[in-house]
Amino acid sequence: MRKPQFDYLKCQRQILVDMHVPDWDPGFLANFDPIRMVDLYQKAGLQAVMHYCNSHMGLCYWPCTVGEMNKVLKGRDIVGETVAELHRRGMASCAYYSCIFNNWAWTHHPEWRLVPAGAVGEGSTGSRYGTCCFNSEGYNEFMHQQIDEVTKKYEFDAIFFDMVYWPRICVCDNCKRRFRQESGAELPGKVEWTDPLWCKFANSRERWLNESFKKITATVRQNAAIPIFNNASPHPITWLWGNNVEELREQDLLGGDFRLIDMFSGFQLFAGVSKSTVVYMNAFTGYIGAGSCVISPEDQFVENALYSLAFNSPFMAIDAIESNGNVSAKFYEEDLRKVFDKMKPYEGLLGVGGKPIADVGIYFSDASRMALFENGLSLSDEDLNDVLPPTSPHITGWVGANRALRINQVPIVTITKLQLKELSKFRVIILPQVVRMSDEEIEAFKNYVRDGGKLYASGATSLLTMDGTRKGNNFGLAEVFGCSLEGIDYHRVAYVHPQIDQLKEAITPRSVVAHGAPRHSPPHPTKITTRIRPVADTQVLATLDLPYSEEPGSREDHKFSSIHASPPWRITNDPVIIRHRYGKGEVVYSSVDLECDQAPTLGGDPDMGHPDYGPSLLFVAIIKSLLGDAPVTFSLDADIGVFAVAYDDSQNHRLQLNIANIPPLPPSRPVPLVKVALCAPAGKKIKALKELPEGSPMLFTVDSQGVARTEVRDLKHLCVIAAEYA
């Protein structure tokens, strides 16, 4: 088995050059020269290059024996030339292979095609993209033969597989046949998360994808001991695309463009799941996607590369070959070089410390990337297939919780079912609308609270099993929550009315916070509020207020109490937030998913422009009350655009705190003062603080609780603090 010449996992500065170019015009790629490209890579200061073996066109860039080579190359092996020249100049080679997006295969083998339910989207008539199905044995054989050939022939240092997901629900004969063989039933025609048959199909799609990628990785590992990864970007968006953490764990590292979701949230998820590191890939310039993407070097560094540095990760810029094979030399020689020169001093910190550490874990659930309002939708419904931005309450709640706690400087990480045996590491765990839960998850969270953990849960968390409705139509965690479910109500707007001083003070000068749309227009989606019956020893923290009418109201029907809004009118005693002791721990359960109601990062209602962080303030106050008064791993007193990521670099007996200044909008300006507090691991004491990478000593004090305090002045982009402990 061939070993790599270069350690790809230690390559900080990388690039991907898109080359999805057809061959029906002899002018295409006429000016492309792999030797000239490697010369530009070297001038940019790159350490690794991801280059194409094929593209979404399905045409290969090496003389393949299976499939078809791009004919404008006239047999020139640009894959082989690129690998050899990269290695000669001291750079790593990462192969790119497009999986199910393959126009050549779609055209020549109709029986391999992915058939979207309703024939919409990629793969339908008139689309530029031809997609094939992972359940097609013929296509799998074709794909594995190509992968086997290319990994035997060339000495890659890593390989990346793009488009490992289901872009639509496939109803091809291959999928129908496989589901019939496995379940004895036909494919369901509509979504129904309470129906065992639908759940079996949804679960099967994920399993099929996992099995397909395992076969791909097995093919590579027969030939080369190199890192393998795919495009992880689709994972946190929707159940429809079929990815899950089992598939992510098959990979040696994780990569993708995380701008499909909140950047910080995406990094948190992937950093917690990855076996090694996370490669953030983002378009810098060139014809990417729908149009030309151009961004200045300074903004590129702040908005993209700086996130990578904050998470001790590589950054991969994305350029695109122009159709004639040209690129901008200035981009490589000047613009890209400026970005990478700023990164280079931190090269030695790549991958240091393992996974981020924190006091609060926000739970991400593959199974809950759905929504109850999807029940009854046909598989071709546009409301189902229009997945961006994500509409799942769990996803919006997970992002909202990350955003609210990040800007309030609460130490957080994202956790998944892979960490179910490690829950005791966290003082507080957040379950944002985790609607579908397995028996293993139910038991793990019960034990966590029973043994002293603190839990926040919202909405329909634990209502459904992986196979449908839970017995008794009640929460699986009802005993832990301290309440039973009476029903689910849908409100255009509801109001949370705090009943204890701590929460009243958190939202002052407000007396209530709105859940949903307090104004008459424009229309907003309805919000779910669970009706609950608390047990006797449960404390009610907040109750429900409702507007004059559930309907929008008009001049004619008089169903409103104020022309501009729908303010509280019906004051109830119905509990919406409760606190309950369970074993040695406690739970705050909220009928409304406060974490989903976060105001945008930029501030303000997108329609009116006036910020209201009421739900965010209430949510943060609840989490801080669960944390209690004991010192946290770290805390900052800083602007909204400043955040920190902490690592326990136990090999060097030090905590590493990466403090980044990424404002909501460019330009980035230095922050005059950031106050920092750091707490050593249990049983340890902080002995010294140093600023990395130079190792300059920092002045600090230590209080009676062992918390080290220091200050960072004029934070421009990044400050890395090493807290040595013993």
Regions found by a protein language model. Give the residues of each.
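N-terminal structural segment of carbohydrate-active enzymes
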Residues: M1-L59, M91
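Carbohydrate-binding surfaces of carbohydrate-active enzymes
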Residues: R2, L9-C11, L40, V72, ...
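N-terminal small/glycine-rich loop or linker at the start of catalytic domains
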Residues: F6-W24, A119-S127, K275-G289
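Short, solvent-exposed turn/loop segments enriched in Gly/Ser/Thr/Pro and often Arg
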Residues: D18-H20, M50-L59, Y97-W104, F160-V171, ...
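Active-site mouth loops of central-metabolism enzymes
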Residues: H20-F32, R128-F142, A290-E298
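Aromatic-lined carbohydrate-binding/catalytic grooves of carbohydrate-active enzymes
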Residues: M37, Q42-D77, F101-G126, Y154, ...
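Short acidic catalytic loops
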Residues: V49-Y52, M143, V150-R168, V428-Q433, ...
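Active-site-adjacent "subsite" loops/lids of carbohydrate-active enzymes
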Residues: A95-Y154, L187-A202, G400
